[in-house]
């Protein structure tokens, strides 16, 4: 449970922040009327594919159909978003090709979400909204007014937020759960940091937030932060040597253009196979040690604005650009495998703590707690789960049974064999609804049923203490950096596997090849 709770807490501090560009989630922010395309030396638009296809089908993804109308509408939104970012919009055919690739991957992910039965109800969306508003020190009503002022309806925003939470939970299950960082790896990482004092600052994270934190002051020093963008030329699984050579040649051509001074974001938007292509290739910011080793070796010593050489990975050929770098202490969006908004559109809603931290002891109030979790499903509704926990609570308060026995019998959490014991919990270790309910309890008190993204809980506080967690925080930060280092390639591997196992009939791509052969 603790690993899952921490995973969602990390999601709330990163992905939810990344969804907000100028106060909007990325997908919602794109749901605005498209502005006229900029004039200039842009190539004349080729005939729209809708003129060439009678059936109106752009692609078939397993059993789902993506229509040409969907592609056209998504292309208008993508065009408006690129213009807002100051990125040159590709010609219509290229833009639709890129948009269709994104729609295909989104459809594959949505199919996986449905297959795994991942659901997000209204209460969980409300919790996410309250969390975002709280961390940005505004009320949910003020946040709603800000969003609606931008032209996005509240219903659109909620739907976008729900979709993004579902997708993030999919990534947690499919990718995050398979990344295991051992204690030995953490020990080795910390020893390496000791030999490199400058980099060691990356593991000095701020203390977990206590209730009612004071506003942060900008830090003056901290770990090296690196903001990267990429162009990815994907090499499909099972490609022949000739195909790999052709793709390498394509990547080398793009590299030459980037080195010559062509706009990197425009090149990425028109040519990259990466999931962040239509954001100009932006992957966000991380401490240097948080990027994959391949990326650090290729771009770690480059200055802002410089472009790396060709980087080959298991997924293809990468071209990296250092968008910005800093000695630390400057607010930066935390990068994840999911696409991130470009930096020229800073979010008005900032989330997550600074990487840098003050030196010295880090004292927090720890809570020793235990819980019983009942998950909801198609056979266990919210009402049924809550009623069962209320019955268990009545028996516990009557003294007829022991908490640990009820946890072993009924809890669906991994802590059930230990009687639901969570051990000593630091502030911020659990999701906000769980933590708020836990903090309101006196020692030995049992909460009413509490709803979290994982299900319904009964929580009992056993005791509290003041504790110096400096070493624990440093180890936790080291583990997080090691995790982030693996997350990007792991996510790309998962996307490639998802694609290779699917039936995809890309009719726009077929039409383009047919036209090329007839020339």
UniProtKB/Swiss-Prot annotation:
Signal peptide: 1-31
PpiC domain boundaries: 223-324, 364-463
InterPro entries documented for this protein: OMP_Chaperone_SurA (IPR050280), PPIase_dom_sf (IPR046357), PPIase_PpiC (IPR000297), PPIase_SurA (IPR023034), SurA_N (IPR015391), Trigger_fact/SurA_dom_sf (IPR027304)
Keyword Lyase assigned: no
EC number(s) recorded for this UniProt protein: 5.2.1.8
Top-rank taxon, per record: Bacteria
Pfam families from the UniProt entry: Rotamase (PF00639), Rotamase_3 (PF13616), SurA_N (PF09312)
Keywords linked to the UniProt accession: Chaperone, Isomerase, Periplasm, Repeat, Rotamase, Signal
GO molecular function terms attached to this record: peptide binding; peptidyl-prolyl cis-trans isomerase activity; unfolded protein binding
Biased composition annotated in UniProt, kind: Low complexity: 31-45, 197-207
Renumbered residue ranges of the record's region Disordered: 31-50, 196-221, 328-361
Role played: Chaperone involved in the correct folding and assembly of outer membrane proteins. Recognizes specific patterns of aromatic residues and the orientation of their side chains, which are found more frequently in integral outer membrane proteins. May act in both early periplasmic and late outer membrane-associated steps of protein maturation.
Designated name of the protein: Chaperone SurA
